[in-house]
């Protein structure tokens, strides 16, 4: 889907591909946010694998109740694969999407202070999800909080 300057070597992602085999339809807003998130990750990230030098390509695919991580080197040669169960993240994901829906509705009808309160809740859930993700990736992937948050 997206790539960054391949000359930026180091412990970082330079390409991210999301497999949309589920065929799920997303709103234009959701697609825009997804594209921005990928762009932001590629612009600034910390991503490494124990015993492997970067840069890396990351292919993510949802398979049942797991996310399949396919990690490759800059030549697109596979160097690691693993599955991560979604279960531990399910509540945070569900709550986050609910708060986002509430936020988009609030933009049209609520006061700035009410919108700010909803946004603070969204950010707190985002942070919680980031911490959970980092814990789930511990030992498999080396990353920082900012990258996990994106």
Predicted regions and their residues:
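C-terminal charged interaction modules
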Residues: 114-150
């Amino acid at each position: 889907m997206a790539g960054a300057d391949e000359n930026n070597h180091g412990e970082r992602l330079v390409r991210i591909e999301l497999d949309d085999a589920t065929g799920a339809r997303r709103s234009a807003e959701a697609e825009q946010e997804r594209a921005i998130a990928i762009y932001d990750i590629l612009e600034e990230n910390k991503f490494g694998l124990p015993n492997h030098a970067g840069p890396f390509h990351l292919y993510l695919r949802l398979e049942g109740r797991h996310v399949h991580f396919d990690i490759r080197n800059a030549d697109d040669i596979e160097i690691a694969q693993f599955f991560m169960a979604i279960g531990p993240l399910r509540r945070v994901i569900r709550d986050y999407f609910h708060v986002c829906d509430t936020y988009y509705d609030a933009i049209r009808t609520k006061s700035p202070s009410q919108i700010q309160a909803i946004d603070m809740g969204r950010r707190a859930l985002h942070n919680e999800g980031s911490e959970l993700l980092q814990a789930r990736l511990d030992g498999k992937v080396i990353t920082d909080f900012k990258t996990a948050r994106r």
